[in-house]
Amino acid sequence: MQTSPIASIGSASSDRVGVHWMTKHIWCRRPPCNERISVPRRKPSRHPTKHRTFSVINPATGDSLAMYPIATQTEVRAKVEKAREAFRSWSNLEAEDRATYLLHFAEVLRKHKADYAETMTLEMGKIIRESIAEVEKCAWAADYFGQNGPAFLRPDVVATDAMRSYVAFHPRGVLGSIMPWNFPMWQIVRFAVPALIAGNTVVVKPASASPQSALNLEMAFREAGLPEGAFQIVVGDRTTATALIRAPVSVVSLTGSVATGAQVAREASRDLKKVILELGGSDPFIVARDADLDAAAKGAVAGRFVNGGQSCIAAKRFFVVDSVAQEFLAKFAENMRRLRVGDPLDPSTDIGPLVSRTQRDEIEGQVKDAVAKGAKVEVGGKRGHRAGWYFEPTLLSHVTKNMRVLREETFGPVAPVVAVPDLDTAIREANDSEFGLGASVWTQDLGRADELAKQVESGMVFINGIVKSDPRMPFGGVKHSGVGRELSRYGLLEMVNIKTVEIFPGSPGASAVRKETE
């Protein structure tokens, strides 16, 4: 008998339910034997200050994992000042020396991969396979910038009328970052690693849903030998984030919603601080009539349901040419029905819970709105389990523009499919959005690939593949999907001051500069 795709979590072993314990910054399913359990992150003071606190909830069970103190404005500024002090020595190291720390950091991540992955899954519900892959990707990024960062930072020699002309790259200072919960380690690492190799120091305020994953990164950097103050985590809420933006940082980075990005940009503009914003996405997935439909259907499942659909670069709007729409829909539905919803700690699970009740209710509201306006539910369509914040993988057909699932960013396991008369219409409909992060186009006419990529209004276009982030390629969007780029040399250059130097005959020190830049 075939197992239902909406599998019960009630059969999970008892060590995966109820209270989870934390020791030494790592979550475990059981308390260590004969060990008294506590969750302090620092030695208790004889004169403790009272903090507001928040609770982290396991989205698979609804149980509380731990309470965390909300950092005050004074504490945030103290962290930034510590980062400023660390910057003096860190920025004066050779890039090759800074790279050594990043390579050690990658080793530490791999060493603690299993523990870090379990923490991530407990905090935000990501299935354990994807959590492990996320830690591995963080290590890859650290290796990549450790191996390539020094070359990226070498001066560019330019031929001008001067005896010697070059472009130099210098660190900006302390960089402040506000990061989300959906990729709680990767989002931080892909910002912090290029920032650090460039000679900056970093203070990160992680999402309140996943603070321990961020603290684990702080621990990993410490174990790798990074100088104290070069990378710090400050845990808290919106007031903490505001305090970080207003602190004396040189750059503010945010990964979040369009509305939040606009608020951060306004706040940062008061002091003319540079911003790097990776904002919302409603990526189109376009299927041409000559597409390999089997490959496209498998790609649609992978592109839509990674991280339970909670990804800025997940495929969120599906435009399929009429002549193949029914066949594609059938293949898409067939692949979706194989997805197993269940305990995210179970390696056989494909879809875990959404991060919160609020997120689950938002997705449910978007589906109800679509159905009320004429959409047809082909697969799923309702809550998947009474315990935790589950929602079934859902496929909608007969979707129209007036439905929220097309107008808004749908941050969950819902795939709306729109049939269109031709490829030109598909591209026009795909571009009819405030978002422009990524796009996926499926066609066997590779002669048109470059032209199609040019026509789609997005920062990233993948032909016959799903959108992903890769340390070797720039990541970012257009329109309301962001400002600036992350990853690759282009992302690293967002985090440096670019200095023009021209030396004419007779300038003091000309020979020394020539030697340095050759």
Label every model-predicted segment.
Residues 58-67, 286, 340, 367, ...:
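Conserved C-terminal structural/oligomerization subdomain of aldehyde/semialdehyde dehydrogenase
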Residues 110, 154-295, 420:
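Rossmann-like NAD(P) dinucleotide-binding subdomain of oxidoreductase/dehydrogenase enzymes
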